[in-house]
Amino acid sequence: MSALFLGFGLPSNLFGSAPADRPITAEASQIRIFDGETLGLGDRIIRLSGIAAPARGEACGSDAARADCGAAAAAGLAALLQGQDVSCRIEGYDGFRRGLGRCIAGGRDINASMVEQGFALASISVLRPLEVAARDGRHGLWADASLMPAEWRRR
């Protein structure tokens, strides 16, 4: 009898849980940028895993030269995704129940690219060499070290 039941089989996502290895994808027109590490793919909110970018409105620099480093990081992410479809594999969830994902656009690893271009810090060891190269090359937010958010300067 169990063979008969198994023969009919129920879809594994019957109750809304997609298989863990299925990526979440969105066409370019369905992508929203919230900040330098968070994007919307259709109705899903994804935080890029393994990186930390300044939040929108996070001021950096001296009193004489204030800048919105969060807006710069968001603009960096928008430039990477410009006109491209995105696919993300969810690796877990954060405290806000956002999916933590590794994302690809145009064959490019977006998480690594944000670090490589100097718009995010590496929070996993495999990306640290990219962070060092961005800092040494003064890319992105590293271009003017006096403008870095305080927590970045402590690293």
Q: Where are the regions a protein language model picked out?
A:
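Small beta-barrel nucleic-acid-binding modules, primarily SNase/OB-fold domains
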Residues: 1-155
